[in-house]
């Protein structure tokens, strides 16, 4: 799912994104994909249809939103499209 989302995001004008890598050198709880879209900070936590966020992931998502960024749990490319469409005014 992450690969398909990144492939899509790389085609979106005014969107710069990257995959945040976990593991021992990553920061726990940081969403999977980070973007700058039309100058706005956007973070996507990617989950399967049955996947659930952890308490730490929810906390990070809430912090991003409180700081004025956009953060969302997505399960498909269509979910990402919806988030980006809602951001464009």
Outline where the language-model segments fall.
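Catalytic phosphate/metal-binding cores of nucleic-acid and nucleotide-processing enzymes, i.e., regions
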Residues: 1-89
